[in-house]
Amino acid sequence: MASLTGAAAVLLAFILAYSTALTIYRLFFHPLARFPGPRLAAATKWYEFYFDIIKSPGGQFFKELSRMHDVYGPIVRVNPDEIHVRDAAWFEVLYAPNPTKRNKYRPSAEMAGLTLGIHGTVDHDLHRRRRMAIAPMFNKQSILSAEHLIKQHIDELTDVFESYLGTNNPINLQTTFLAYTTDVLYHYMFDTDAGYQRDSGAAQQWRHSMDAVAQATPFLKQFPSLLSRVALIPLPMLIWVLKRIQPDVAGLLGTHQLMASIVSKYMASKPEEDQDELIATKAVKPRTLFHAIEASSLPPHEKAPTRLAQEGLTVLFAGGETGSRLLAHTVYHLLKNPEILEKVRKEILDAAGDSNQLPDMKALEALPWLTASVRESLRLRAATTSRLPLVTEKPLAYADWVIPPNTPVSMSHGDILHNEDIFPDPMKFMPSRWFNASPQQNRLFVPFGKGTRMCVGMNFAYCEIYMSLAVILARFDLELYDTRWERDVHYTRDCFLGEPDPASPGIRVKVVADHKTFTRS
């Protein structure tokens, strides 16, 4: 017993000595020791842990980050290893285009547990090759060729809205639009019918799974390698356990199983003689995301089933939630501004003329009020609230500061898009600001990011959003139902994507009229 007590004392003494030495190093000898910021944040990552995990309702470090800049200036050491900059003029320096090389900060890349997808790729050159492989799925020509596919799912979306007419029940926009965007993604990317819009129970469960991810994200930011460790557990066993302790997360892992099944079917049906088709996909839209990767110049190990599945999951998770929340927020803002809504509706109907047919994407993009409303919603409600750290192998200069090489450096989209010097009255929904936008405003409209890590799905997102908005706004009269800015719309938590109050029931509307515009022909 005495020996155990002695060993514990030695271990405790070692931990205290190590912690003291590490703190002294970080405060006085670390390459970032001279940079401004709270001393406690420089000494330990538990400072950030407190704001993201302990301080209610979680995910609060983004507010503390803003306070740091108010106190210490535009460049701040936010934890022992990382620098954050709040200066719009420097955004295009950090998030620079090719040939500038920027690696992703490894903990940030590992957080989602999908290190084989483009979002989780650390190395700049490997990211560029992986991105080029899937680019044919996201170019404008490919997307415009699939308008008919998107229209099929818009028909199902209108069926959902129509089913609420006369019921006096509200429709949850985030749940409904998530089912739509997810169905479109499965069909367009994987040639698979997910059927969420035809199964309200499955749609609601998928919504709960996304909410569970949001709730877990602040924790995963603090322990970014956790999911990689969990992935070592066989998936069926992991699902069995989670169904009993956290069924919403188990549902998310069911998506991993489904993606593995989709990849298996693709691999089994891939004929050896399909090379002519693969070559042709370089000129037209590939049949699926996996066909695009197969047709690329990536080496064979980059076309392995596990790699394909992780790339598929990356696209699915990145595209579904962001598109659905943009749709919900745009509808919210237009319903709060009925005079703008009427202008948007009128120009959509004028573009259609007497045809009662939805105008194509090119025509919709040319509509000034619709375009300005989408841009303004993107600016106001840009999905990513987290800072986005990159690493460079060379020193970076900011003002009089020289940031050492291999230091993670980050900026935040909100600091640009809500900057009152760039966008006056920044928290007001004002689409008209885009009619006479300055070159600076257009250049710093960065909801999809900038540089080599810019969102690859921008054109796809615009297409599914423009087309569905045009139909919903022209066809249905909606009114908000018990929806409050402070509780249901305003971001109060950083869960990588911004999230409202945990008690929010979501943005909800009632369907009060159906004008039968753009109905099935």
From Swiss-Prot:
CDD domains assigned to the protein according to its UniProt record, in alphabetical order: CYP58-like
Transmembrane segments: 7-29
EC number, UniProt record: 1.-.-.-
InterPro entries per record: Cyt_P450, Cyt_P450_CS, Cyt_P450_E_grp-I, Cyt_P450_sf, Cytochrome_P450_monoxygenase
Keywords annotated in UniProt: Heme, Iron, Membrane, Metal-binding, Monooxygenase, Oxidoreductase, Transmembrane, Transmembrane helix
Annotated metabolic or biological route of this protein: Secondary metabolite biosynthesis
Example of a GO MF term: heme binding
PANTHER family, per the entry: CYTOCHROME P450, N-ACETYLTRYPTOPHAN 6-HYDROXYLASE IVOC-RELATED
Name of the molecule in the record: Cytochrome P450 monooxygenase hepH
